[in-house]
């Protein structure tokens, strides 16, 4: 049958090796179960090293992959003796070659490969910026058609380190529409013949691609970290590393205790933080994100603004936080900018806004006593090296092929 099967977390129904986002019986997540229970590393650069726990048959030959290194200067500043940085971005001096500068590229490579292996339709996705850039890059490399819907706030983030190809189709939305509006429009486009939804957090190729951040850390450190820090918008990254950690626990060589998830959202838009403070499985919009669109506009790290995150679904972020006794933080713009300046001055690489939010949450955790000096900590910087990339590459802006005034626009108007 191949190297994995899909299993529904609620009813237990199993599916073969296919591109499937949902169970036919219920709304719970599907999870990949790999035939190899021990992690076998391939002699490949980048993400392809972790082939045995990725849902693809052909090897991924990209040099893009996560790196992990032990911090010295920043760790010393915080008084931590075992701080490791998981860096997804462009930093060739450290062996980091993600040319879209975001860990979303870890999702894009296996997703596009899985699609190619299971029918080869055009992929449709919504993006606040980073995901779209990653999928556009892989589309330009492979020639697989991709349709990307972005709110106006994300359009400037849609650049490539190579000239865009005809396989990349960008649809931007008019001012006043946000990421969730983009998700709704993309959902409609994905129903057209020959199209398939990229699936967001429901896509096991995305989750297991991002989970390689935890795999790389465990292999580098020799064990799973005690604590894991990341900024979240949908929470998919947090879910991904939790699932990867469970596989590592089954492997047996990397420890039995799951890392404690310490995740951050960016004020004023913090619906998952609000729900988790009350240990609620449900996000209540009128309580947790009152006047959401205004909050989204005021958020520094705009990519962290999903109004419909996979929080309460079985196998979603609520379950990940519960299983790891997790903590969530609400970070201000000022805290993020201060953390960014401190990190960049000490470590010598530029980081993107979500990484700044994650860094600020670590500073807060140290201040509040949520980590101790000698514990092993993994700070996942999910994007960085943009300034460094510009020293080596010419960047090309992707021009939209159409503009949508709202998510309910007639698809004929878009001329897809």
UniProtKB/Swiss-Prot annotation:
<dbReference type="GO" id="GO:0000287">
    <property type="term" value="F:magnesium ion binding"/>
</dbReference>
<feature type="binding site">
    <location>
        <position position="130"/>
    </location>
    <ligand>
        <name>pyridoxal 5'-phosphate</name>
    </ligand>
</feature>
<dbReference type="GO" id="GO:0030170">
    <property type="term" value="F:pyridoxal phosphate binding"/>
</dbReference>
<dbReference type="GO" id="GO:0019295">
    <property type="term" value="P:coenzyme M biosynthetic process"/>
</dbReference>
<dbReference type="GO" id="GO:0018114">
    <property type="term" value="F:threonine racemase activity"/>
</dbReference>
<comment type="subunit">
    <text>Homotrimer.</text>
</comment>
<comment type="function">
    <text>Specifically catalyzes the beta-elimination of phosphate from L-phosphoserine and the beta-addition of sulfite to the dehydroalanine intermediate to produce L-cysteate.</text>
</comment>
<dbReference type="InterPro" id="IPR001926">
    <property type="entry name" value="TrpB-like_PALP"/>
</dbReference>
<dbReference type="InterPro" id="IPR022401">
    <property type="entry name" value="Cysteate_synthase"/>
</dbReference>
<dbReference type="GO" id="GO:0030378">
    <property type="term" value="F:serine racemase activity"/>
</dbReference>
<keyword id="KW-0663">Pyridoxal phosphate</keyword>
<protein>
    <recommendedName>
        <fullName>Cysteate synthase</fullName>
        <ecNumber>2.5.1.76</ecNumber>
    </recommendedName>
</protein>
<dbReference type="GO" id="GO:0070179">
    <property type="term" value="P:D-serine biosynthetic process"/>
</dbReference>
<comment type="pathway">
    <text>Cofactor biosynthesis; coenzyme M biosynthesis.</text>
</comment>
<dbReference type="GO" id="GO:0003941">
    <property type="term" value="F:L-serine ammonia-lyase activity"/>
</dbReference>
<comment type="similarity">
    <text>Belongs to the threonine synthase family. Cysteate synthase subfamily.</text>
</comment>
<feature type="modified residue" description="N6-(pyridoxal phosphate)lysine">
    <location>
        <position position="104"/>
    </location>
</feature>
<dbReference type="GO" id="GO:0005524">
    <property type="term" value="F:ATP binding"/>
</dbReference>
<dbReference type="InterPro" id="IPR036052">
    <property type="entry name" value="TrpB-like_PALP_sf"/>
</dbReference>
<dbReference type="Pfam" id="PF00291">
    <property type="entry name" value="PALP"/>
</dbReference>
<keyword id="KW-0174">Coenzyme M biosynthesis</keyword>
<keyword id="KW-0808">Transferase</keyword>
<dbReference type="GO" id="GO:0044686">
    <property type="term" value="F:cysteate synthase activity"/>
</dbReference>
